[in-house]
Structure formats: structure tokens, C-alpha cells
Amino acid sequence: MTQEREKAIELALSQIEKQFGKGAIMRLGADEALPDIDAIPTGALSLDIALGVGGVPRGRVIEIYGPESSGKTTLALHIAAEAQKLGGIAAFVDAEHALDIGYARKLGVRTDDLLVSQPDTGEQALEIAEMLVRSGAVDVLVIDSVAALVPKAEIEGEMGDSHVGLQARLMSQALRKLTGIISKSNCCVIFINQIRMKIGVMFGSPETTTGGNALKFYASVRLDIRKIATLKQGDAVIGSRTKVKVVKNKVAPPFREVEFDIYYGEGISRLGDLLDLAVDRKIIDKSGAWFSYGSDRIGQGRENSRNFLKEHPEMVAEIEDKIYETAGIPRKGGKEEAA
């Protein structure tokens, strides 16, 4: 670069910084330019690995969507619990007015410290979300759900009135305002979304998410969560086998799929997930129905092996270390054993 051009660019940079403040523009090579992506664990180690950065990225918009009772809120509450374990503040905008505090507590959420809002309208919910993000003190904010963000005009109108595109416009405007401040505040904003069917679709998937297309564009990570099997103990249903597909990922390669168990009243089975991962990575040997780690026999059958690991946290920590090492992702926080 010639000296004149160098001087011209330096002058332009100084004018931009003078007018818009320090940090408005910077060279990518500078230390303070773009920090490494920090993440909050999801509560499922396999999903942390699939996301490529050890969890859901901070300072980004995340969308979790799927059919009813597929585990969307469970996953979001696990992320909130993990943020609290790391010393952060979690907030929950309960637009559906359906948050089960007892269940959240069972998943590890410190409910006494959880900030909860139950707004009357979609506008109120998104304004509260904006104020919380602007504070710069909230680490994770969950909005449950986009479908329940009903515009004020629809609430105040008659039951049969048509309000075409109102919610989509509301979401589009809110995300335009929110994206910049979310990035600056390093807050992870999670939108839970529902699925609807498009009428008359002949080819391709007829499924679509509510609230228009804006969220699809603004989200850095989109997770499609589905129940694929029922877990039983005898005749009693005790949980569900769940599959999560990373449909979109701006921070790592997308389209990875993982499976884990969600138990009723317990949430994601961290130890079951750990067992599956360790077998896949040849850290634990599976011969017939027997699971063994090194020279130690863990148990016969998956459930017995899971119970053995629950009683041996030092072995769990050792296996976790090996999984993190082979996956090449950083460990967040301390070595905590979770069922």
C-alpha cells in the first residue's frame, strides 16, 4: 500500500472513531477485534460437540423449534441452568404462561435467582427482552415461545378479526433492533418456536415455523428437536429418546445430528449421553450387553451402567476429560457430575 493511501485510511479511521467512538471500526488482526466465540453448555455433551464450540454461542440469536412435547423448553431450561452454574444470570420470558417452576428446579435451575416475566402482549415481551439485553448483565434470555408473542392489536380485537402478517412484522422489527445489542452485550437469546403445516405443499416438507422468516435469517444457530422413541420401564413410560439436528450454524459446520434421552422429572440424561459418546469414541467397550471401562466392568445393560456411573463421579470426570480431548472443544466451568 502506498504512503498516501495509508495516510488516507488512517485519517478515515480516526474520523470514524471520533464520530462514532472507539471500536466502531478496527483491523481484524488487532487483539481486541473479534474475540474467540464463548459458549454456554446445553446440558447434553453430544450436542455441545455437534455445535462445534462447546455449546450455544454467546452474543447470538438461537432458535429451538419442534413439534409439541419434543423437549424444546427442557433444552432451554438446561441451558439456563448451565449459565447459572458458570455464575451467570438467566432470564425467562414466559409468553405461554406455562413455566413449571418445580420442573425447572429438578433440571438444576436455581429458581430463586431466575428472572421470570409473563407479559400480556408480544410488544411487551420483546420490549422487556430488549431492556434485559441492554442491561448487559443477563447471560441467557429464553423467550417461550414465538407463537405466543401475540400482537396487541390482535389481543384487543374481536375473535374473528383477520390480522395478516402482524406477528411477522413484529418479529422482523424486534430482531432488527435486538441483533446489534445482543452481540455487544454477549447475551445468548433463545427463541423457542412451534411448527405449523403449510397448506397445499406437494413437494418438500410442508412444515414451517411461526413468526415469519426474520428469525430464520437472524438466528446464528437453529436446532430442530424431535421425539423419536418412547422410553419404558416395564409398562410405565419414563421418558423419550430425542433427536436434535443442527439445521443452521454460523459458528461451525451445520447439519450434525445427535440423540439423547430425556427422562420425565429429570430432564436430559447426561450420564446416558456420556455413555453413548464414550462407546462411539471407543473410550468405553461394549461387548454384548456388557459395558467396560479399561479393566473395570461398569454393568450389564445401559440402565445398570448409567446407575454405576452415577455412583462413581471420579470415573465420569475421567471419561469426560477423554471425550473433550478427542472432540477438541473447550470444557466450560468445573467438573460437575449430573445425572
Swiss-Prot record:
Q: Where in the cell is it found?
A: Cytoplasm
Predominant place of localization = cytoplasm
InterPro entries membership:
AAA+_ATPase, DNA_recomb/repair_RecA, DNA_recomb/repair_RecA_CS, P-loop_NTPase, RecA-like_C, RecA-like_N, RecA_ATP-bd, RecA_C_sf
DNA-binding among keywords: yes
Short name of one Pfam family: RecA
One Gene Ontology MF term: single-stranded DNA binding
**GO cellular component term of the entry, any:** cytosol
Residues that hold ATP according to the record = G66, P67, E68, S69, S70, G71, K72, T73
Q: Which UniProt keywords apply?
A: ATP-binding, Cytoplasm, DNA damage, DNA recombination, DNA repair, DNA-binding, Nucleotide-binding, SOS response
Q: Does the keyword Ligase apply?
A: no
For this entry, list what GO says about its biological process.
DNA recombination; DNA repair; SOS response
Q: Which family does it belong to?
A: Belongs to the RecA family.
Q: What does this protein do?
A: Can catalyze the hydrolysis of ATP in the presence of single-stranded DNA, the ATP-dependent uptake of single-stranded DNA by duplex DNA, and the ATP-dependent hybridization of homologous single-stranded DNAs. It interacts with LexA causing its activation and leading to its autocatalytic cleavage.
- Stated name of the protein: Protein RecA
